[in-house]
């Protein structure tokens, strides 16, 4: 049997401690884990795809089986190109489940060979989102407990221009 390969897609604008928690836990389960950084055209990003990738590479440097790449198009197609058999999605609350279930069902329809794995976030991060981090930081709030230090510095630099 070959390597167990999975993809964790997201905009990660910016990556939070909640994202990192899911990545670290998935990295223990899968032999190879691709963090695919997406550019969501419906959102105005704070960071470029390249900046987000660099931050993710820094905070996952201790995980040798994690690879950070940018991706566009359908996640299920990207996963297939990488030889992945799984897409990992973090769930913060029941409210995330309905949306994620619809996406998982569509992905299953498009490619029945790729499973979606839902991972419940650590309860201490259940309220956390990139949008919330940006909102707090915009008003000079303290985000040190919400994001890795490299991200804290980068977010502060963006809002203190």
Curated annotation (Swiss-Prot):
InterPro entries: Cyt_trans-like, PPAT, Rossmann-like_a/b/a_fold
Keywords: ATP-binding, Coenzyme A biosynthesis, Cytoplasm, Magnesium, Nucleotide-binding, Nucleotidyltransferase, Transferase
Subcellular location(s) of the protein: Cytoplasm
Entry binding sites for ATP: 11-12, 19, 90-92, 100, 125-131
Primary localisation category: cytoplasm
NCBIfam families for this protein: coaD_prev_kdtB (TIGR01510), cyt_tran_rel (TIGR00125)
Cross-referenced PANTHER family: PHOSPHOPANTETHEINE ADENYLYLTRANSFERASE (PTHR21342:SF1)
This protein's name: Phosphopantetheine adenylyltransferase
Organism expressing this protein natively: Listeria innocua serovar 6a (strain ATCC BAA-680 / CLIP 11262)
């Amino acid at each position: 049997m070959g390597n167990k390969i999975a993809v964790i897609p997201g905009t990660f604008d910016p990556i939070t401690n909640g994202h990192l928690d899911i990545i670290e836990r998935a990295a223990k389960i899968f032999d190879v884990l691709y963090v695919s950084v997406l550019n969501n055209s419906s959102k105005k990003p704070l960071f470029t795809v390249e900046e987000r990738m660099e931050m993710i590479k820094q905070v996952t440097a201790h995980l040798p089986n994690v690879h950070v790449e940018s991706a566009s198009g359908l996640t299920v197609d990207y996963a297939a190109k990488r030889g992945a058999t799984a897409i990992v999605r973090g769930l913060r609350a029941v409210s995330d489940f309905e949306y994620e279930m619809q996406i998982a069902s569509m992905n299953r329809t498009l490619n029945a060979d790729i499973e979606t794995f839902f991972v419940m976030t650590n309860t201490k991060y259940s309220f956390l989102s990139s949008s919330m981090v940006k909102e707090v930081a915009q008003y000079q709030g303290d985000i040190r407990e919400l994001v890795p230090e490299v991200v804290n510095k980068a977010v502060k630099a963006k809002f203190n221009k």
